[in-house]
Amino acid sequence: MEKSGPQRRRLAAALRLLSVEGVNSDGPKEVYAEAAEMLEEVVKGLRKEPRRMRRVGFRQGKDGFGKREFDFGMVDLSPVSGLANPLAPPLRVQRNEEKRATGTVVYPGSVRTGTGWVHHGYVAASVDEVFGAVLAWMGQPIMTGILDVRFLRPCPVEEEVRIDGWVRRESGGVVFTEARVEVAEGPVAEAHAVFFIVGEDQYKRFEEQRNRKLVAGC
């Protein structure tokens, strides 16, 4: 991945633009037929390449807060924030404090609903991603248990959206989080979530199952 990373990200960026043009353009059928044939050939070529195995676990060393970050094996490949994943808008997340992070994203026109706004499912996924980043930096191998998003107004496409997420409290193996979603015009949504700490061993089992399926072509 390290050697091909820049070109993977370039490919993903091109595919994002393709998705927007595929939705917004209105050309003759021949244009789309030609594009489809070209892409189908590209897919055939990529399917001949080896499958990429993912690795999870704690990273070496500690950060400035004395924590060991947990790597979910999704660097660059997350469907929400991965620069090498064409499905990602992508969301960019920065750490502010030990238990707080901020995400920014500009949703493309390809996620526009019939009313012209961003599909709320994308906003909810972005909130979940910000929470996951906070907990990964805290060294917590977690899974989402409950994600409750209350929308206050529609979310615009092609405008910067800011998501602030933080840990409200921890109790045993459960972490409670909150978030606020805003655009220039004001608040878009408020969110609360409950995460369960599942541990590194459980994530290792998930990793093994996932990699076996990749090898089998599932």
Protein language model regions, located:
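Short histidine-centered catalytic/ligand-binding loop motif
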Residues: 107-121
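Hydrophobic residues positioned within well-ordered beta-strands of beta-sheet architectures
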Residues: 101-103, 147, 163, 177, ...
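Active-site helix/loop of acyl-thioester processing domains in fatty-acid/polyketide metabolism
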Residues: 96-100, 118-142
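Long amphipathic N-terminal alpha/beta scaffold segment
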Residues: 34-111
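Short beta-strand micro-motifs enriched in acidic
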Residues: 94-96, 166-170
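HotDog/MaoC-like acyl-thioester-processing domains
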Residues: 1-67, 155-157, 168-218
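Hydrophobic beta-strand-centered segment that forms part of the acyl-chain substrate-binding groove
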Residues: 1-2, 29, 130-162, 167
